[in-house]
Regions:
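Extended hydrophobic blocks
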Residues: 1-28, 32-35, 87-89, 93, ...
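Membrane-embedded segments
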Residues: 31-62, 66-86
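Short His-Asn-centered micro-motif
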Residues: 32, 68, 99-101, 128-129
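Extracytoplasmic/secreted cell-surface and envelope-processing proteins
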Residues: 39, 75-76, 105-108, 134-136
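Short beta-strand elements at the ligand-binding edges of bilobed clamshell
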Residues: 39-46, 98, 175, 179
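Glycine-rich phosphate-binding loop at the start of an alpha helix
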Residues: 47, 102, 106, 110, ...
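A structural signal for isolated positions on well-ordered beta-strands in alpha/beta enzyme cores
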Residues: 64-66, 97, 125
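Short beta->alpha junction loops
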Residues: 70-71, 96-106
Length: 197
């Protein structure tokens, strides 16, 4: 069942533009972090993800924004700098929730799902690089299912996506390589294993 869900996710259309019909209530835009440079500054992929997240936030003014990423460098976490960048680009501080403990995609998903549950947020638009999106969707779906089992409810959470295109073309972005598939299944197995014990 898990694998068939993942195979479906691998066929997901990656959106390079913010979709028009996103939910208008109980909706979160989740922007995934990217490792900071050694000097504690944001690298290009993270800034590009933020630009996509900003476009989604401006188009959906009722949505909360969750910035996710720990791993401190020079006293900064990804989430801290992401929040500062969004605020400097006109997003109100009250809209932004930070998840600054995670060190990888599995933890991003687990810790962010806890925030979604706590804040009563249902549906999610994930924002990350095209090369990372299928893995992120797989793990976030698994995290949501795990929480549902743990608290004995069905959140019926819907995931949408907007990507920063880090491929020469969208056609290439939609081609799942063997390496990418292996990493997705590895993280899925790890996520499932981590959460069972």
């Amino acid at each position: 069942e898990r694998f068939s869900a993942t195979e479906k996710i691998m066929k997901t259309t990656l959106n390079t533009e913010v979709p028009d019909n996103l939910p208008q209530s109980k909706h979160a835009i989740v922007i995934l972090g990217y490792a900071l440079a050694d000097d504690g500054t944001m690298r290009e992929p993270l800034i590009e993800r933020l630009k996509v997240g900003l476009a989604a936030a401006n188009k959906n003014p009722n949505s909360k924004i969750i910035v996710t990423g720990g791993v401190p460098k020079q006293g900064n976490t990804e989430a801290k700098l992401m929040k500062e960048w969004l605020m400097s680009n006109g997003i109100a501080e009250g809209r932004i929730l930070t998840e600054d403990k995670s060190t990888d995609t599995v933890e991003n998903a687990l810790f962010t799902t806890a925030i979604l549950e706590k804040e009563g947020l249902k549906d999610v638009t994930l924002v990350t690089s095209a090369s990372h999106m299928r893995r992120a969707l797989t793990i976030f779906t698994e995290a949501s299912d795990f929480y549902d089992k743990m608290i004995a409810k069905n959140s019926d959470r819907a995931f949408t996506n907007v990507v920063y295109l880090d491929y020469p073309s969208i056609e290439e972005a939609h081609n799942v390589t063997k390496d990418e598939a292996m990493v997705i299944y590895r993280d899925l197995m790890r996520a499932t294993g981590v959460w069972q014990y």
